[in-house]
């Protein structure tokens, strides 16, 4: 990160600049030789006062500059230390996330909840949401965490509108809040969610998670119940629309960008093929989801769902 720029050119540099008193014109003789510059007593006394004032002004200017240097250096050191601290916290946060230490991660990041760093804030939004999804979290706590996550994501986006992750987590958190605000709000939010997922993909076309989430948006809209579609048509001139084929395209695209990056992408590939009545490919992707190593609570839930869907195949056959 860039540090503050020091404007040295605005101040005198060194003692020579601070004490640079100029001799009057005519102090040299007609041939360029130096000659004594004799003054009368009263003139000498006047120049003595002027000299003292000039000396005092120069001294104060110099002291002021020295003070400015000390303060500037202190500010720079503090800023550098703060940047280093944030970078260190982000490294710890990423390690805890990869280790599946959901609650420890949340406890770490909430210590910095007043931060103005977008990278820290979107991670805090993600951590709040992950704690909300833990099986031991009560419904009351879950609702609080969901709204808390949205607030952190919103702040992250305000701090950096060019952040792919900030757009992504803002969209995710809006979707979560919709579960508490009714059908009308949920349908209205669908447009906002799509906009932010598309922006995240635009900012980083190699982010498999954003592509996957756009696939979820398409899948969710495609399976929207008839009564929700009717409400959408009444409330909006052009209600949100999509197809399972479109969803499938995003899920495959995410897999191409980063193979096996997420158990839920494997599960949804299987479920989408089921919607399209392709049981062979559905079984292939559901088996991959069932066999995916469980690192998180969500991975375990996905393993269970994939196994149940596969058993449904066996029972029918």
UniProtKB/Swiss-Prot annotation:
Subcellular location: Cytoplasm, Cytoskeleton; Cytoplasm, Cytoskeleton, Spindle; Cytoplasm, Cytoskeleton, Spindle pole
TPR repeats, residue ranges: 171-207, 225-261
Gene3D superfamilies hit by this protein: Tetratricopeptide repeat domain
An MF annotation (GO) of this entry: microtubule binding
InterPro entries for this protein: RMD1-3_a_helical_rpt, TPR-like_helical_dom_sf
UniProtKB keywords: Cytoplasm, Cytoskeleton, Microtubule, Repeat, TPR repeat
Lineage top rank: taxon: Eukaryota
Residues with the N6-succinyllysine modification: 168
A Pfam family of this chain: RMD1-3
GO annotation, cellular component aspect: cytoplasm; mitochondrion; mitotic spindle pole; spindle microtubule
Chief location bin: cytoplasm
Signal listed as a keyword: no
Subunit structure: Interacts with microtubules.
Similarity comment: family membership: Belongs to the RMDN family.
Protein name per its UniProtKB record: Regulator of microtubule dynamics protein 1
Taxonomic source organism: Bos taurus (Bovine)
Lineage: Eukaryota, Metazoa, Chordata, Craniata, Vertebrata
Gene transcribed to yield this protein: RMDN1
């Amino acid at each position: 990160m860039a540090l503050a720029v020091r404007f040295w050119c605005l101040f005198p540099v060194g003692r020579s600049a601070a004490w640079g008193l100029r001799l009057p014109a005519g102090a040299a003789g007609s041939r360029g030789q130096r000659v004594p510059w004799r003054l009368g007593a009263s003139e000498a006394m006047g120049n003595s006062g002027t000299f003292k004032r000039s000396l005092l002004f120069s001294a104060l200017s110099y002291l002021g500059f020295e003070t400015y240097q000390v303060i500037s250096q202190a500010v720079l050191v503090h800023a550098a230390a703060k940047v280093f601290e944030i970078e260190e916290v982000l490294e710890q946060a990423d390690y805890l996330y990869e280790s599946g230490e959901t609650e420890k991660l949340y406890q770490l990041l909430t210590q910095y909840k007043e931060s103005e760093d977008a990278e820290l804030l979107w991670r805090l939004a993600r951590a709040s949401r992950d704690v909300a999804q833990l099986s031991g979290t009560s419904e009351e706590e879950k609702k609080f965490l969901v709204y808390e996550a949205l607030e952190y994501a919103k702040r992250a986006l305000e701090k950096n509108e060019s952040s792919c992750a900030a757009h992504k987590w803002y969209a995710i958190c809006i979707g979560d809040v919709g579960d508490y605000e009714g059908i009308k709000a949920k349908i209205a939010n669908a447009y906002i969610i799509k906009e932010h997922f598309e922006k995240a993909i635009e900012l980083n076309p190699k982010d498999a998670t954003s592509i996957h989430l756009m696939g979820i948006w398409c899948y969710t809209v495609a399976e929207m119940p008839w009564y929700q579609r009717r409400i959408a048509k009444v409330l909006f001139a052009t209600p949100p629309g999509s197809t399972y084929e479109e969803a499938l395209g995003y899920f495959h695209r995410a897999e191409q960008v980063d193979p096996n990056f997420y158990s839920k992408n494997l599960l949804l590939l299987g479920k989408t093929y089921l919607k399209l009545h392709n049981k062979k490919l559905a079984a292939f992707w559901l088996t991959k989801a069932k066999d995916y190593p469980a690192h998180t609570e969500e991975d375990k839930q996905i393993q269970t769902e994939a196994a149940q869907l596969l058993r449904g195949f066996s029972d029918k056959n």
